[in-house]
Every structure is written in C-alpha cells, then in structure tokens.
C-alpha cells in the first residue's frame, strides 16, 4: 500500500520554496531574452537592440513591483497599463511570458532532479529523446492487435490551468500574479487563440514556453490518474483504492464521481482489464494500444470522454479517438507512418522420406516517412511549390554563397537525421533533390543567371555537399569503416525537439 501511496501523493519536496521574488530579478528576463533569440533553422536572423531590450526589462520590473498596477476594478480595468501600449507590445509580452516560464520551470526542475536521484537514473538525457519512443514501439507493438489514436482535447479554461498548477507550485503569490498575467495577456494580445469563455488553445504552433508548461501540468494531472487506473487494472480487488479517492476528493472533483468510483471500483477495473496495454504520448497526441478485443479500447474511449468532461470541464468528441487494427491501418505519429505487416515465407521441411512446405508469416514493424506532408512542409518554408517543384529562396539571396549552401545543407542533414529510422529512403532522396535544386536556383537568382549557366560557369563542385553518399548524412564518414555496410534503421538519443519541417501532423 505504501508503494501506491507514494505514487499518488502530492510531492512535498521543497514546499516552502518561494518563487515570487524571482519574478522581479532582471537576470531572469535576460535569460528569457536569450531564449527568444533562439530561432529554428528555417527562420531568418532576428535583429535586436540590447540597450532598448534592457530598458524594457527594467520598465516591466518597475511596473510589476508597483501594487496599484495589480489592483483591477470594473471602472479602471480598461486603463490598466501592466502590459502597456507600446510599439514593442508583442516583444514585451513574449519576454514576460518567457520570464514567467523560467521561474515556473525552477520548481519542476527541482522535482525532476530529486526524482532522478531517488530512482538512481544516470543517463536521463537519453529518455528525453523523441527517437527513444520508436524502439519502444518496435519491441512491444509486434504483439498488439489494436491501437487508439487519441487527440487530447483543448482549449482549456485559464482557471483550470492555474488550479492544476497550484498542486505543484506552492507559492500562492506567484500563482496570483500568474493568474493576473494570463487574463491580461489574453485580453491585450492576439497571441492566444481565445474563446468567449476565456479558454486558450495551447497545442497550436507558435505558442510560448509558459503555456507549454501550463499545458504539460494539465497533462501530468490527467495522466497521473489515468495511468494509475491502467496499472491497477491487472490487480483487481487485491489493491485498495482509498488513495485514489482521497486525491480525487482533494482536487475538488465531482462528489458523485467519487461515490461511483468508491462503490464500483473493482468492477470498473475488471471492465478495463487487459493482459498487455501500452500508453505513449507526445505533445497533444497519445496512443493506447492493446492485444485484446476492440471492445476493450471502446470502453477506454468513452471512459476518457467522461473523464475529461468531469475533471477538466472539457468536452471531447468521441470522433477524436480513432481505434484501428495495426495489421490493416497505419499509425501517423511524430512524422512517421507505423504499421505491423505480415511477411509471408515458405519453409521446406523433410521428415524421413516425406517432405512438405509450410507457410509461415512473420510480423514486422514497418516505419516509413509520408512524402506528401513533408513536401507540404517544404512548400510552406518556400523551398518548393505544392506539387514539389523546387523554387528559389529570395530571402536568402543577399547572403554569401557559402552561407546559403551551408544553410541548405544543414536543413538537409537535420531532416535526414530525424528520419533516419525510415524503412524506405526514397522520400528522403526526393527531399534532397528539392533542397539541392532550390539552393542552385537561389544562387543563380543572386548572380542574375540561370541554373544551367551558373553551374556550368562555377562547376558542379559548388554543390558537392549535396552530392555525397546519402548514408554520410546519417553516419559520419570517420565514425566507422563499416558504415557503408549498414542499411537498417537508426534511432538517435539526442533529438529533443521537432522543427517545422518534420512537425507536419
């Protein structure tokens, strides 16, 4: 019982830490300013003025430290100047958001370090890699039959987010200021997709670090109860469920839900019983797979719909949860199409004077890269049109030749690096062709020439980085003398984020 008590209880580590004073420290916003300047490989360089940004930080700290700016009434709510009306409003709001995120992340970082030390996990950075998910799928999904493709519902009400976060951050002053900032931020800017009920959409592209933290706290709360139910479904009546109900009651959930769970908990667990069940999530998409009948996943489907509605006041349409058979349908996840295929084979067997042939089918976990979404991402980044014909990149034409080539090659290498686990490399060859010709057309545009004349004048050696062996984009040539002989899938443990070109779900 102590094991499950520790699993569900609220973390009491460092409850007395106060984060509120950090909000008024200038170095926090300097750190946030550096984070803003880190752009993805597809974005142009951002020019900025260090002096003006420092003045903005000091002005923001002065405004936040004055109590009268934090008091809002019905009469003066429109005159509140906490966020101001300056020409740097977007940058100012973004920097405040990043500064809040740095402060809030402190508590989560302390909890993570404490958890890793307690569990004696040394190489925790390997667990952060996106590619670490796919070896797990390869090892376990071969024996599963059905999978639920789940889109986690949003938008979420601002107050629900703050209430969820307060179970992890114990500083009430910081949470009050955070609540004030969220409502002001929503009213003053268009960076948050809002609804009349003050709900925000967080999983869309371009959102800020702070809202991703709030969204992850909501996911952590949802998964802490959901995964507990999954883990306990195999124990049935032998496990006491009192701890679960205490936590649900503590969170102020609906009393009727608690009573139903308390009286019918063993029956509920029996309905969800499955010999093998696996759960995987990345961002706003999750997978629930089982080797049982589709009826089991249907039960989980309607349980999740009611769970989100009762606990987070979110209505999730049942159509957002798709149940597919792995042997007949592909799973679109993290830029890959994954499926379980049957490879037929014939085995000749001989016993004494009699011989016969046996048909045997071996399951294989197949992972490929869909070319159409990838071309759509290239078209969005202005490397080609919607049908995949390469075009020039006028925004880069003012740079030097070496800089243009290096930038195209770096994008190509990153795409190959992320999609190194694909069973088929044909689509990657197409991507390399598009980027190589787009690079040539960009250089020709810069020199006011045609592609043919430009390459003929300077020689094909100008693009030799694109003409190297394809596997060299995956394996460094100096890494091993056997790199040419290996043609299988490769998963990397250093990929912790997805850029726009591969985030095409």
UniProtKB/Swiss-Prot annotation:
Pfam families: Intron_maturas2 (PF01348), MatK_N (PF01824). GO terms for molecular function: RNA binding. The keyword Aminoacyl-tRNA synthetase does not apply. Coiled coil: none annotated. It is found in: Plastid, Chloroplast. Disulfide bonds: none annotated. InterPro entries: Domain_X, Maturase_MatK, Maturase_MatK_N. It comes from the Eukaryota. The keyword Plastid applies. Keywords: Chloroplast, mRNA processing, Plastid, RNA-binding, tRNA processing. Transmembrane segments: none annotated. GO terms for biological process: mRNA processing; RNA splicing; tRNA processing. PANTHER family: MATURASE K. HAMAP family: MatK. Usually encoded in the trnK tRNA gene intron. Probably assists in splicing its own and other chloroplast group II introns. This is Maturase K.
């Amino acid at each position: 019982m102590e094991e499950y008590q520790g699993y569900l209880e609220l973390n009491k580590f460092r409850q007395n830490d106060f984060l509120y004073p950090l909000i008024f420290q200038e170095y926090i916003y300097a750190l946030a300013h550096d984070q803003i300047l880190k752009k993805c490989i597809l974005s142009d360089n951002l020019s900025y003025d260090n002096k003006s940004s420092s003045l903005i930080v000091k002005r923001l700290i002065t405004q936040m430290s004055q109590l009268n700016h934090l008091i809002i009434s019905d009469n003066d709510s429109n005159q509140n100047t906490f966020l101001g009306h300056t020409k740097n409003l977007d940058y100012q709001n973004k920097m405040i958001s990043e500064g809040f995120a740095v402060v809030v992340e402190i508590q989560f970082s302390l909890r993570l370090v404490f958890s890793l030390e307690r569990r004696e996990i040394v190489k925790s950075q390997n667990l952060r890699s996106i590619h670490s998910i796919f070896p797990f799928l390869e090892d376990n999904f071969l024996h599963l039959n059905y999978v639920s493709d789940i889109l986690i519902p949003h938008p979420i009400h601002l107050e629900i987010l703050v209430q969820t976060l307060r179970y992890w951050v114990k500083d009430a002053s910081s949470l009050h200021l955070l609540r004030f900032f969220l409502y002001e931020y929503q009213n003053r800017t268009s960076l948050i997709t809002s609804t009349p009920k003050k709900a925000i959409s967080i999983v869309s592209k371009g959102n800020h670090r702070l809202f991703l933290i709030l969204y992850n706290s909501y996911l952590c709360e949802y998964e802490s109860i959901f995964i507990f139910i999954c883990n306990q479904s195999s124990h049935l009546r032998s496990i006491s469920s009192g701890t679960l109900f205490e936590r649900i009651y503590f969170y102020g959930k609906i009393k009727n839900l608690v009573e139903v769970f308390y009286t019918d908990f063993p029956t509920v667990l029996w309905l969800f019983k499955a010999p093998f069940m696996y759960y995987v999530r990345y961002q706003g998409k999750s997978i629930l797979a089982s080797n049982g009948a589709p009826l089991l996943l249907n039960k989980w489907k309607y349980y999740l719909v009611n769970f989100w509605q009762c606990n987070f006041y979110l209505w999730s349409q049942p159509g957002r949860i798709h149940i597919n058979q792995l042997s007949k349908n592909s799973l679109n996840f993290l830029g890959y199409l994954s499926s379980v295929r049957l490879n037929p084979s014939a085995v000749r067997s001989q016993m004494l004077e009699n011989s016969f042939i046996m048909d045997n089918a071996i399951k294989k976990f197949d992972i490929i890269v869909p070319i159409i979404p990838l071309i759509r991402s290239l078209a969005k980044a202005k490397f080609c049109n919607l049908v995949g014909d390469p075009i020039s990149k006028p925004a880069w034409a003012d740079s030097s030749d070496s800089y243009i080539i290096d930038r195209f090659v770096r994008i190509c290498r990153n795409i190959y690096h992320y999609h190194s686990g694909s069973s088929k490399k044909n689509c990657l060859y197409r991507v390399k062709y598009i980027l190589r010709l787009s690079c040539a057309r960009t250089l020709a545009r810069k020199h006011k020439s045609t592609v043919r004349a430009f390459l003929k004048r300077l020689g094909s050696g100008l693009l030799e980085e694109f003409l190297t062996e394809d596997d060299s984009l995956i394996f460094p040539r100096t890494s091993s003398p056997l790199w040419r002989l290996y043609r299988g899938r490769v998963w990397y443990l250093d990929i912790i984020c997805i850029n726009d070109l591969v985030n095409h779900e």
